[in-house]
Design a protein with these regions (language model features):
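Ligand/cofactor pocket segment of small-molecule handling proteins
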Residues: 1-32
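Structured C-terminal cap/extension of enzyme domains
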Residues: 21-124
Length: 124
C-alpha cells in the first residue's frame, strides 16, 4: 500500500507511517514521520531505527524493526491499549486505568504480558 503513495510525495504531501510493523520500510522508502502507540513503551528502539535508516544502516534498522514487531506480536492478542498501559505500569510509569467501556487487563493477561516482556528483553 505504501508504494502506491510514493509517486505523490512532495513538499505538499508527506508520507507518515501509522503501522508499527512497517516503520523501517516506510522510512527507507522516504516516509517522513511515524505515528506510533508502541513507541511509548520502547522509545529508544524507535530513535535507533530512525538513526539507522538515516545512516543507511539497513542491518540495524532490520534488528530494530524485529524488536518492535516482537512487542507488537505480544500485545495484539488482547486489548491493545490496555496492554500498552499495563506495559508502562510494569516499567514503573503510571499511565492510568482504562476508561469504560474498556477494561484493564485481568491478572492472567498481566502475567502473560509480564513474562512476554521479559522474554523480549523489555523487562528484567
Amino acid at each position: 500500500a505504501l508504494q502506491r503513495w510514493l509517486p505523490y510525495k512532495s513538499d505538499q504531501f508527506q508520507i507518515i507511517c501509522g503501522n508499527d510493523t512497517q516503520v523501517s520500510r516506510s522510512l527507507q522508502a522516504g516516509g517522513k514521520a511515524i505515528v506510533s502507540s508502541t513507541a511509548n513503551v520502547q522509545p529508544k528502539v524507535f530513535l535507533e531505527i530512525l538513526a539507522a535508516v538515516q545512516a543507511g544502516d539497513t542491518e540495524t534498522a532490520l534488528q530494530c524493526q524485529q524488536q518492535i514487531n516482537r512487542y507488537v506480536d505480544l500485545i495484539v492478542r488482547t486489548n491493545l491499549i490496555a496492554n500498552i498501559k499495563a506495559s508502562l505500569w510494569l516499567m514503573g510509569i503510571d499511565a492510568g486505568s482504562m476508561r469504560p467501556p474498556q477494561r484493564n487487563l485481568f491478572d492472567d493477561e498481566m502475567n502473560v504480558l509480564q513474562e512476554g516482556m521479559k522474554a523480549i528483553h523489555l523487562l528484567t
